[in-house]
Amino acid sequence: RGGAPVGYLSELNQLEQNAILFLRYWSQCAKADHDLQNKFWSNITYDLGITKTRQAIDAFDEIFTLCVKYSRRPIMKHDLECKCIGGDESCFANIIGFAQDGELEDALLLASNLVAPKFASYLVASARKFAASITISECNPLEAEESYYQSYSLH
């Protein structure tokens, strides 16, 4: 049931798309081909810079560990390159989105559908950390030392 298509990645905002892509990547990294892995990490690092990418990875690792250890049932995910999203992925993305927006009760309610209720608050706290690290602030652009991929103009 949690794998039934409920929408498309293109219908989500960037944070929600990234949350689903991270979930898929973490779930499939052992079987994803090397070129696909390099492209995934290159794109994320290019967008965020090295420091924020590391923070996002650490926060997401907490989320994924909670989901693996304490999930109420197996969380269904689509293939890494699939354009549609499943019900569980949608729920997951909404937890991240609600956590970012400070709507913690809504995030907690959805989190308790994915993990055992006593661990839902930990999932929401980790979701807030992930959202903060993966969001690029318009008033706080990447600093030069943060991004290995930053370009420089000579003239």
Sequence positions of predicted segments:
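Polar/charged low-complexity regulatory segments
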Residues: R1-H155
